[in-house]
């Protein structure tokens, strides 16, 4: 969890995803799908452009405007959508939170033995 200045609310996912990728020594090209909570469509566009997320990897099943924005359950909704993407190995769930805060979580599919 990291953030930006509060006046730039909505783009908190940018430093959060960048920090996560650097920590794991990955690039956005190593990620198969990104679920970015869509409180506002302009926020998703700004974050997508700054992170260089290919459109075919971003909110593959629609964003929160299309699928719903459950108060207090956005993170669970993002992760659930990612878990149903059974053919994607590495995925990220990220969201901007009030005051410029952003968080991001990386998931890697485990196929077992």
Protein language model annotation of sequence segments:
Residues 1-113:
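Claisen-condensing/thiolase-fold acyl-transfer catalytic domains that form or cleave C-C bonds
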